Amino acid sequence: EKSWVLSIGFVGMAIGAAVGGFIADRVGRKTVFTATLIIFGIANGAMALSWSLGMLLGARLIIGLGLGAELPVASTLVSEFSPTKQRGRMTVLLESFWAVGWIVAAMIGYFVIPNTGDWGWRWALAIGALPLLYAIVTRVHIPESVRFLEAKGREDEAEKAVRYFEEAGGVAPV
């Protein structure tokens, strides 16, 4: 049973990674980018409240789907939004945050689980739902991908997104 709890998350990640980019090309990168973290946060909360192995496994699968779909979409957005000279550095920085997340998760497990009684694992998982707040506060303000908008014939919105990044970067409009 323990191996399933870990393995099912990787199954979800594989599926999410396989379909995340496809869905983002259809409905928008920003939509999927925001949805993946919301899915992750809600599923983490569901895992913390699970009352059966089946519910725990289902929530873990959904967490994997969210994380897996995040991978291609986040990398694509960072690549599209980064200046050419900084694109490689920005992508590496993005990917390094996975390691930061693992370290934070390990620290939460180390400090929270043994110090909060029988419900320690639930508290640790509930803390994992906090990225949901991050998604609500920050990701909803990220503009849609310029390439996606252009591909959908939404040139005015694409131009607005370009202006947003020019202003943020201190670049004068062309």
Which residues are covered by each model-predicted region?
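Transmembrane-helix signature of 12-pass secondary carriers
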Residues: 1-174
